[in-house]
Each structure stands twice: as structure tokens, then as C-alpha cells.
Amino acid sequence: MSIEDLARANVRALTPYQSARRLGGKGDVWLNANEFPTAVAFQLTEQTLNRYPEPQPKAVIESYARYAEVKPEQVLVSRGADEGIELLIRAFCEPGEDAVLYCPPTYGMYSVSAETIGVECRTVPTLADWQLDLPGIEARLDGVKVVFVCSPNNPTGQIIDPQSMRDLLEMTRGKAIVVADEAYIEFCPQATLAGWLSDYPHLVVLRTLSKAFALAGLRCGFTLANAEVINVLLKVIAPYPLSTPVADIAAQALSPEGIAAMRQRVAQILDERRYLVEQLRGIACVEQVFDSETNYVLARITASSAVFKSLWDQGIILRDQNKQPSLSGCLRITIGTRAESQRVIDALTAENV
């Protein structure tokens, strides 16, 4: 019997999540992972590396609670928001019995986490405007324990209609957990659902320091939920999810000075997004640029696969979305520096397709 044969059957059938880093490339313009384009400097202040870290670092929890305007007991910190996704499925879904539901085109880790754990994935594609198909969701809710909704949605960039979210929360009350993935909420803070926690005991909000806080390499995320949900998740999370250096840097990022710096970065990205969108809409091979509330834009490109490869060969790495439902011909472009935007603009302008 081979090692492969010893693995669980569902694991043998898995295809690993195709992250930007896994897909690789040898570019010098990296616009495929929705990262902040330049590094932010931090100094380590904690020198107690001979001791295990706090299971849930108090300074980080309290700082994030103040920032998100929730109570500390409503905050769980984890190794990125991706760990929060996995914890929710592990805690609330029985493998082989329960299901999760999500609405493509959307973030790929919902399915990867569920499939790894052995939980059924159900999909209800979004409508033509990428909003929720509420009747379709209601028809498929039987046996569903967790519903994932990404807002703003990755990769399409739009906010999910708040009334649709309220309708979904009423529809699932007493039946399922509803997870609002707000990885990109700093770019449209008015759209957060964190203030709804008191109204909906089954609402969970996922957050991260990877995007606007410019700390993708830190792997630090947050789950916001009512204390009853947090207490369930504390039963399944690893004892020390954040190393001491990670907690140290996260606390600095969440200081008043750190939050002010983040908001300056957001303003910078929004300015650059306006410039890039304006320029893209004047390029011959760009058929459509969709409105975005995030640090990336989705564009439909003539001969997109060939254009993607052409830019790849020039060292400009974008994210091909052709395999996502309803996104034929689409490429996703992270907002970078002005120089990086200009590289994309010049390369697309030169395409003869």
C-alpha cells in the first residue's frame, strides 16, 4: 500500500487551492494577490521568545475590538482569516452530514476548507449583477450549517446589497451560521456588518490584516461574532495561533498611529484605482472594467488568455479568472504603485488582439 493509499479518500481527490504564490511566475510587477504594493516597517519590541505566547493575545484582541467597535469577547484572532473559515466549518459541520453554501464567483477557500474536512459544498451562483439569488439559496438550505458571503466580493469587487444580507440572516435564523467575509472592508468601511452582531446571534464577520494593513506576510486574521460563537471556536482553535512576533506587530498595526497609517494607504489605493480604471477604459482590448469597492479591479479583455500570457512573459503577473462562473474573458488586476499601473496600461495598449 502506497502513502497515497493511506490518505483519506476525500484528501486524495483534492486539488490544492491555487494561491497566487502557488501559481508562481517570475515577474517584477506582482498584481495577482491583492497585496499592498510596498512593505511597511515595524520593529519587534517583545523579546520573550523563550516563552509560549498568549493563546489569544490580550493587547491584540482589545485593540481590534476598539477598531471594529465590538466587545473584546466578540473577537477571535487566528492565522489569517483563512483559519477562521476552517474553524467555522470544523466547529459547526458534521463531515458526511452537513453542508456549507456559497455563491460563485467568489473566494476559493470556502470550498477547499470544506472539502478538506469532508463537508459537502453547495453552490448557488449569483445573479447577473453578482448579487445574491435569495430564492435559490432558500431552496438549497436544508442541511446547510454555514453560509459564506464575501462582501466586497472577491474577485468581482462589489458590495453585497445590505437588504439581501438582512433577508439572508432572517432566512437562516435558528438554522445556520452566516459568515460575512470582510477581507476588503477597509476600502469601503461604511459597508461593514460588524454593527449587526447584536441583532443576529448567528452572524459572523471575518477580517484580516493582509490587505489595507499591508501585512499579508504576517498571517493575522480576526473572527467577529457573539460570545456564544466565539466560545465554540475556542474549543477547536490551536493553543497558540499567533507567535509572539506576529502578535507584537499586529498590536503596533492596530495602535492609533497604525490605524491612521492604514487609512492613508487606503486613500492612496483609492486614488490609484481611479487612475487605473480611467486609463483601462480607453484601451482597445479592454471590453469592460467593472466597478470596484476594493484594492483590485476586474476587467473583461479581448483574447484574455493570450493577453494574460503576454503580460506574464513581460513580468506583469495578473490573476486569470476565466475558470470562474460568469467570468469568461476576465482578468483581475491588483492596484499597485503608479509605476506598476503604468506598466499594465502600456502593455495592454500595445496588445494587438
From Swiss-Prot:
Keyword Transferase: yes
BP GO annotations: L-histidine biosynthetic process
E.C. designation(s): 2.6.1.9
Top EC class of this enzyme: transferase
Keyword ATP-binding included in the entry's annotation: no
Pathway: Amino-acid biosynthesis; L-histidine biosynthesis; L-histidine from 5-phospho-alpha-D-ribose 1-diphosphate: step 7/9
Keywords: Amino-acid biosynthesis, Aminotransferase, Histidine biosynthesis, Pyridoxal phosphate, Transferase
N6-(pyridoxal phosphate)lysine modification, residue list: 211
GO terms for MF: histidinol-phosphate transaminase activity; pyridoxal phosphate binding
SUPFAM superfamilies noted in UniProt: PLP-dependent transferases
Disulfide bond positions: none
A Pfam cross-reference name: Aminotran_1_2
Needed co-factor(s): pyridoxal 5'-phosphate
Reaction(s) catalysed by this chain's protein: L-histidinol phosphate + 2-oxoglutarate = 3-(imidazol-4-yl)-2-oxopropyl phosphate + L-glutamate
InterPro entries: Aminotrans_II_pyridoxalP_BS, Aminotransferase_I/II_large, HisP_aminotrans, PyrdxlP-dep_Trfase, PyrdxlP-dep_Trfase_major, PyrdxlP-dep_Trfase_small
Family: Belongs to the class-II pyridoxal-phosphate-dependent aminotransferase family. Histidinol-phosphate aminotransferase subfamily.
Quaternary structure, from the entry: Homodimer.
Name of the protein in its database record: Histidinol-phosphate aminotransferase
Organism from which the protein derives: Klebsiella pneumoniae subsp. pneumoniae (strain ATCC 700721 / MGH 78578)
Gene that produces this protein: hisC
